């Protein structure tokens, strides 16, 4: 999708070469809609949760390290294709994935926990969790994370900055 918000004849897309490229993109996109098999090819499903933003502080400083950094700096370095889904869409996934990465699922309802347990955590799938996933159910408590993830947690309220990044870029799998 593209939009040229400027007045006619003065926008950044007002260039014959750019518009020729846009026309080609539209042509390719339109043809792809007629492909018989348009199912996802990725083995990794990345899950984000829009309502979890409501449980952040007003500064919303968690979005940058948990979502944007991971998507633009971490996941892009893996070279592995991934599909992006909302936590609310877990029941509608088109097929099982080999790996699931939950980026910001702070609040996970009882119904979502059942779906994760019955549909996601099965058949040898790898499930990776980031910061505070499942911490909120009816209340905020580390036992909520333990129930969801299957590990014991305790909290340390020491203030610190949140940085979760892929490191070790000398390893062959993460080299440019």
What would you call each of these model-derived segments?
Residues 94-106, 145:
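Short, well-ordered secondary-structure micro-motifs within conserved domains or adaptor modules
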Residues 106-175:
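A glycine-rich, often tryptophan-bearing local segment used as a flexible ligand/cofactor-contacting loop or short
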